[in-house]
Design a protein with these regions (language model features):
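Active-site glycine-rich loop that binds ribose-phosphate moieties when present
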Residues: 54-63, 89-104, 131-134, 155-158
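Solvent-exposed alpha-helical segments within well-ordered globular domains of core cellular machineries
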Residues: 11, 15, 115, 133, ...
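A short secondary-structure junction signal
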Residues: 89, 125-129, 186
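Short glycine/threonine-rich loop/turn motifs
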Residues: 119-120, 130, 143-189
Length: 189
């Protein structure tokens, strides 16, 4: 009496702590896995995870690191109940240690990105193309997009003009320099 099965306990804890954009799988063998329902950033405050884990060794929560980028469908954590049954009051204490629905995924907000690349004689066009391709791959999970791609001479006046041209049409601007920045008087800083 007063005990609940491992699956029911895992499901209760997982359901109570899981918030926005987190899907809880059906518990099986005392384990309820948690999955991201969108691309974004995992919010799993370490102090809250530790507080839940400190309640009793019979109920554990493991998550990916706090503020880690995650993708839709990725497993982000698991609640595991170790014994076949646990006291109902202990499950209530575990749930109370973690604010309701505090484990969540903060979805990315799509951003418009302007890219300005400075050019010097001898810089291969393939270098700029590869830089843009790799950046495009990296921002794709965040649903961000390159809305402007401008290439200008590696000179301060040309860079300033390009920045002014695109500043109002984007949420973010990235400048790729044709040469390394060595001091404050360089073109880019």
């Amino acid at each position: 009496p007063g005990d609940i099965s491992e699956d029911e306990a895992a499901a209760r804890v997982a359901g109570a702590i899981s918030g926005a954009h987190v899907r809880v799988d059906d518990a099986f063998t005392g384990r309820a896995n948690l999955f991201a329902q969108c691309n974004g950033v995992l919010v799993a405050e370490p102090a809250l995870v530790d507080a839940l884990n400190a309640v009793d060794e019979q109920v554990t929560l493991a998550t990916l690191p706090h503020h880690r980028a995650v993708v839709d469908g990725e497993m982000i954590g698991t609640v595991k109940v170790i014994p076949f049954a646990v006291a109902e009051h202990m499950v209530a204490h575990a749930v109370a240690a973690f604010p309701r629905h505090a484990l969540r995924v903060a979805p990315y907000q799509p951003k418009r990105i302007a890219v300005i690349s400075t050019l010097l004689p001898g810089l291969k066009p393939a270098t700029v193309e590869k830089t843009l391709r790799v950046m495009g791959e990296r921002i794709a999970p965040a649903h961000a997009g390159i809305v402007a791609d401008e290439r200008v001479a590696h000179e301060q006046a040309a860079l300033i003009a390009a920045i002014k041209k695109h500043i109002d049409a984007c949420d973010m601007m990235i400048v790729f320099g044709a040469s390394a920045i060595t001091d404050r008087r360089d073109v880019i800083p």
